[in-house]
Amino acid sequence: MRKWTMVALLGLAACTGLGSKHASGDAGTSATSGLFDGEWAACQGTTSPEECSRYVLLQRGDRICGTWFHFATGKVYAGRVIAHADSSTEARRTHVCGRRSAETDTECEDGWQRIDKPLRICKGKLSDLMRADGSCFPYYRAVRMAEDLRKALLAEPWMEDCLSGVPGDAP
């Protein structure tokens, strides 16, 4: 239940327009930084902000850790993601876990599923897909993230481990 409460709070933060370094340009006091760092939302096809697909990502060096969320067929799907930045705008998602869906078949309580999928920033937006020709498909826009939510995510034990390099087999 705690996990779903955090997802709901993150969704509400996107609606409230509270501080984010993407929207405000303020790096704040966060121990993380990088172009991927922040909250990203894709709201195409929905009239309810709570149903927007989203990533909340924290970046330390080339390590990107965060959460993902999407709403489909009347159900909430959420989980965690680890990525490795190859450049300032290109990364590869290497590990994922969460509610069983098209994103993962591994619950977070059971560990991490290894994957190799893109995560890119193009035209100021985040993309987790590539077109057939390899070009970027940017549809997640940067949204404001409340600093207290950033701090809460940083305080999660799994996030502390992730930003410190655990699991260690992630590049």
Task: Enumerate the predicted regions with their spans.
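Beta-sheet ligand-binding and adhesion/scaffold domains
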Residues: 22-28, 42-47, 51-56, 84-171
